[in-house]
Amino acid sequence: MIKRLPDDFIFGGATAAYQAEGATTIDGKGAVAWDRYLKDNYWYTAEPASDFYHQYPVDLALAEQFGINGIRISIAWSRIFPEGFGEVNAKGVAFYHSLFAECHKHHVEPFVTLHHFDTPEALHSRGDFLNRENIDHFVAYAAYCFKEFPEVTYWTTFNEIGPIGDGQYLVGKFPPGISYDLAKVFQSHHNMMLAHARALVHYKEQAYPGEIGIVHALPTKYPLDPKKPGDVLAAELDDIIHNKFILDATYLGQYSEKTMAGVKHILAENGGSLDLRPEDFELLQAAKDLNDFLGINYYMSDWLRAFDGETEIIHNGKGEKGGSKYQIKGVGQRVFDVDVPRTDWDWMIYPQGLYDQIMRIKADYPGYKKIYITENGLGYKDTCIDGRIDDDARIDYIKQHLAVIADAISTGANVKGYFIWSLMDVFSWSNGYDKRYGLFYVDFETQKRYPKKSAYWYQQLAATKTISM
């Protein structure tokens, strides 16, 4: 069976500043919370990462050679404003001008994100987005970038508001490492959506000629047994935490009655309250129809069952399959032993979940305009033997997910592009350097790049726009 993607479809690769650039302390870059947090809590740091700060001409030349016509890049906020606000770092500004020029030189369209998990330490230490002053600082930073970088046509404000709150305040694997505080999770989500809305309104008021949107991670949630009301409720509540709360803010400008009922139930079980103000919803209402596109990051789905017990989450960071546990008081318990393939990190491989999520957006949020799949890929323990990397599992993963994207398009969804995570191997926030995603293998000691088998497959796909199943 042959499936075809549109002629104007973007075949992209994704990166992120902190995961790729390295160079964390040079040319005036300010600190981020991750710098110390990784040293204190993990077995790796963000040095050298992929040394994208110096190697970007190599990576962009490879992108062009292999038919990749789009790249996701994030600007490191602390490279522009080392303290998060105030004095501008001219060397940081010059770096991004050079980077974007190199993108255009190689006919690779940059899709630029303003915040990818890396709030400057000077602001993070004051509460990050739990502190409403951070909204003001983010909007000022965004406004500066919109004006300074007219060579950028496609902007996204935030990458994955959901996992930021989840990582910082629920699982506790991101700085500041707070666990099981659901009120902080929701408040962080809400305040970041306010920052998005203000930046979005500013961009449109200035009548910039480009497009702007937001990237959400949207793992699809299913009841373990659809016939059991408790399992159905568990899936709905977990969906509210990770998906529906932020989607409502993005496209409804408010939280639906069902969403708020779920939030109130979760907080009644776990404690805490939210600061939601009337003027917040005036802002969300003003922004809800201004998003030019939605970026969907999709890697996995989850199956949930009813659970009556205390919260316990164990993050599988070392790729030891079966090491995960996820159960939240008053919400539910994720079940990993289902008839679905999973990675060594217990991520469930389920392409149908991406199709279902796209169609959910189309049905529930018809004002979405268009979608890009801004991250999707397979984390794998790749091995390089004499410069050859056979990653057939990754090819199969990408193929299956692109096939359901083609199905969604044929069903009427407006999906305009796909960005594999990641363009080249980068370091993983909570898994280090062993979990590789790239089309190009990076020898982190020499920084030499090697195209994987998947890179050659992706090159052919970009040329033909066809998927052979």
UniProtKB/Swiss-Prot annotation:
Catalytic activity, EC: 3.2.1.85
Bridged cysteine pairs (disulfide): none
GO biological process: lactose catabolic process via tagatose-6-phosphate
Pathway(s) where this gene product acts: Carbohydrate metabolism; lactose degradation; D-galactose 6-phosphate and beta-D-glucose from lactose 6-phosphate: step 1/1
One annotated GO molecular function: beta-glucosidase activity
Source organism superkingdom: Bacteria
Catalytic activity, reaction form: a 6-phospho-beta-D-galactoside + H2O = D-galactose 6-phosphate + an alcohol
CC per GO annotation: cytosol
Keywords: Glycosidase, Hydrolase
UniProt-listed Gene3D superfamilies: Glycosidases
Chain residues that bind D-galactose 6-phosphate: Q19, H116, N159, E160, N297, S428, W429, K435, Y437
Family: Belongs to the glycosyl hydrolase 1 family.
Listed HAMAP family: LacG
Protein name (Swiss-Prot/TrEMBL): 6-phospho-beta-galactosidase
Biological source species: Streptococcus equi subsp. zooepidemicus (strain H70)
